[in-house]
Structures are given as structure tokens and as C-alpha cells.
Amino acid sequence: LRLSLFQVSVGMAVVLLNGTLNRVMIVELEVPTWLVALMVALPLTFAPFRALIGFRSDTHRSVLGWRRVPYIWMGTLLQFGGFAIMPFALLVLSGDTHGPAWIGHAGAALAFLLVGAGLHTTQTAGLALATDLAPEHSRPRVVAFLYVMSLVGMVGSALAFGALLENF
């Protein structure tokens, strides 16, 4: 159950990226829809690297002797880095600054890219760790449970973000 919490965080990040920031950028900041769609699609560019991340976490041991956990840490740090850059990129996109607009677009694109890389890295290494720890006869149930927890994270965070942002 504790190992499934990374899937909840992945679900929350997906809702934050695809739902909340999408609406904020289009409605409040009046960023062109095609540009927002491109930024929302940026995290998917890291999807093909999941096989490489999985292979690397299968074969490479870190300095501490761990295989999966450093990838989960790195993915979490990438997610955090992207979400840390995002508010500043949105401030520049709002037009209340003296800098050129392309800096805000580049910052938002970088933030979306970092979050996407973190999502895929965390999810791939976490699923691999769960299958390593689970007995062979229960692996399908463990993977199914992890995906259910991802959906729980998506639904729960959508309800929470919706309630918190109701006045906006």
C-alpha cells in the first residue's frame, strides 16, 4: 500500500498538468490554444524513453547498491523541478513583466517537459520495484492495484483542485 503512493502522486500531477494548468493558461492568461496543446503534449515525448529507463534500472546499480529507488528519487526531483518552475513561467506569461513573451513560453515548456520526464521515470521505476517485491503469483494484482491507485489519485485530486479553485 505504501509503495502505491507514488502512483497517487503521478495521478495528481497528471490532473494538475492536463486540467488545472490547461484552463489557467487558456482562459486567464489567454495563451493560444495550439501552444497550450503543444505544451500539454510535451510530457508524452518522454514515453518512448520508459523502455530505456526500465532497462537501465534493471541492469545498473547505484553507489548504494540500489537499482530502482534512485530512479524514483530522480523522477520525483524532476517533477518537483518542473512544478517549481511553472509559477514563474506563468507569471511571465501573464504579461506583467518587461521581458519578451518567448521567455514565458520557453519556461512553461521546460516545466511541462521536466514534469513529464519525472512522471515517466517515477512510474516506470516504481512499477518495476513493485513487481520485484511482489511474489510471482500476485504480480498482476499488484500492477493492477498500482494503476487503480493512479486513478484514485486522479479522481481525488480533480475533486480537491475543483473544490479549492471553485472561486476562480
Segments predicted by a language model, with ranges:
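Membrane-embedded alpha-helical bundles of multi-pass transporters/translocases
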Residues: 1-168
